[in-house]
Amino acid sequence: MSFLLNINTLMIIALIVLLALLPVALRKERAARLEEELPIFLSYLYARLEAGWSLRKALEAAAAEKALMPAFHQEAGRIIREAERRGDLSGALLDYRTPSARVTSVLRSIGEEAFTGFDPATRVQVLLWDEEEYAAERARKKAESAENLAEASLMIMILIPLFISFTAFFGGSLELIFPIALLSSITTYTASVALQGVPIVILSPRVMRILPAQLALIAAAIAISIPVRGFSLANPMIYLGIGAGLVALSIPASHEVRKAISEMEGGHLLAQGLATKLQLGYPVERSFQLVRDGRVVEQVRRVSLGIEANPRSRQLHLVLSTIKVVRESGAGGKALEIVARTAQRLYHAYRDLRSRLRFYEVISITAGSLILIMSFA
């Protein structure tokens, strides 16, 4: 009884610590989201500056791009409101602060260029090149972190037969082994799929409504695995049902992620092709008619007809919005060429990340299934 009380006390202390750290965690999470969207923001900004837009007009347009930049559009809106209050856009940029020191430095650099009265497009282009390199490095580090977590979880699952043999030899209970193994499998699966292009995928409202159900199932698996207040561990059939539910609920999101990755490849090829044709003197409408890539042809048709596009990838969303600006302003292919470069770098960074984590996704599903089958032996 005293053992259970000690566990409850430790859980309460851990909960208090987590609640105290929650504001810091939320701030760091927002900073990470801003840094992930920074290359898209700079590319979006540069394309419009190259098309002859003023910096204020480009920021106002960015503030309206909620789907393309879920975090950065709010910062752009705050900058515009601060500039209106002060009557000075460059001053607002110079003094603006964000949760990310890197994003704050970039905005200040743009503000310095605007303060001098020079065209900020060149400075934005240089900043964009730096951010493309940084985004690729960040994707590599995220893959390594996820791999480390996945390897630790896999080690636990690999040692499960040893745990079984050890406890059986000494006459111990096997009750804790299977919940630990299943939770380890869930951890590995989460680590592998959570980073597969999600920052540049636009999930539909239908899939977003499924995410709370997935979190509820994971919370249920954790809750029934903690032996508090004398609560006995559940039958393995419950874990089997939870695992099946997670797999079933992940199917729609996995389908949209695969579609988004396919759109990303078609998106940067589309931008490169159109930029080349425009630089060679092809009319914009004629260039649209020459697009034959099935991954993007429907979205291009929508843009050409003035219908709102609905891409699953933020990268393709960026390309399509730039195409629309180029078409309306007649800016030529240079702006589109820079956006094509950004789109290509984003695609390759997250494609490599996805391929490295796919192995752990498959292993975690297989291991979790095998362990649940073993529980009936």
Which residues fall in each region the model found?
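Bilayer-spanning, highly hydrophobic alpha-helical transmembrane segments
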Residues: M1, T9-L21, E131, A135-A194, ...
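Membrane-interfacial helix-loop-helix connectors in multipass membrane proteins
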Residues: L4, S90-R97, T167-I180, S232-P236, ...
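Juxtamembrane/interface alpha-helical elements of multi-pass membrane proteins
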Residues: N8-R97, S105, P205-E308, L318-S321, ...
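Membrane-proximal, non-transmembrane alpha-helical segments
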Residues: T116-E144, L318, V326-H348
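Juxtamembrane segments at transmembrane-helix boundaries
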Residues: V124, T190-L203
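P-loop NTPase catalytic cores that bind/hydrolyze ATP
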Residues: V126-L127, I164-T167, V284
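Catalytic core of the metallo-beta-lactamase
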Residues: Q315
